Amino acid sequence: MEHLFESDAYMVRQKVMKILGEEFHIYSNESMQSMIGYSKMAALKLKEDIRVYSDESKSTELLIIKQKGILDFTGGFSIVDGQTGESLGTLRRKGMKSIIRDSWVLMDQKENVVGSLGEESGGLALVRRFIPYLHILFPQQFHLRVNGARGTVKYTQKMNPFVH
């Protein structure tokens, strides 16, 4: 799984024109020369169970992201190493705060907060929730901040009518 975390930049492409479910290809950079991960999610599930594989054959499972509860307002997700079964931590939604703009906390194996993930603009986030298709003109942007680390990681959507 090490190669999944070795890159400084990633490109995640999502197939949009799928009838049921979602499919993602993860590349080590924007040139998309080397695919380092693949995920296919089923539609209409009560609990999310996201599996990231090394490629489309699904022969090597790298990462498991599993929703903890069915009706969990705080949206806890366990993150597990697909090779060893070792817990890597938890990603938990900040309930009420996420109504206006998406906010998450990152926790280690012992449930200690080690970082945060949050939508960049509260104003745009609120407007996006009430005006359909505004996300096409103003895509979501997130910042990941890890406690004790310098700088942040920025996630930006790039809109394309067929993939993003």
Model-based region annotation:
Residues 1-164:
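Intrinsically disordered, low-complexity proline/glycine-rich segments
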